[in-house]
Amino acid sequence: PMIYVGMMPLALAILFFFTKSIRLRSKFAFLGIIAFFVASFYLQALDLLWQGMHSPNMFLHRYAFLFSLLLVLMALETLSRWEEIKTWHILTISLFLITGFLDTLIFGHYKYVMTSQVMLTFLFGLAYLILSINSVRKWISAHLFVIILFVFMTVEAGVNALYQVQGIQKEWNFANRDY
């Protein structure tokens, strides 16, 4: 399924599980919902349940936006408790994400992933890492953090949207409107 929330919301959603002030019951509930969504993407019976018990026509996993929404909600909950986040949390999550991305690149056999996309992912990740550490250490104000974060997340979403539309154009070969 086409799922996209951005690197920063993904990192914040993972940090959700490391935030001490969030109750353990809530963490397990969110983890259970995530597991159910992931299982729905892979198990045909659950997928059909989401689709009203009939095979979808062209819109596979049309419920995938709920997974993205769940990650955004977790990210917002973490962001509302930003003062609890320590530098080691950020470094741990960064290492986890780097390992995941490298694992996907090395063992994923995704021939459509271009070097430019990998470099952009690395640069955005580096920018988010530097920005987050500066915010946690209080080297920049919270207001400036939000503004810079907004700019980077908007650009990242725009670049990702462009690459997705270009990828769909290549795969589905949209009809030409020139007559």
Give names to the regions the model predicted:
Residues 2-15, 68-75, 123:
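Hydrophobic alpha-helical transmembrane segments
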Residues 5-37, 128-133:
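Hydrophobic, aromatic-rich transmembrane alpha-helices
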Residues 31-37, 41, 45, 54, ...:
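Contiguous transmembrane helix-bundle modules in multi-pass membrane proteins
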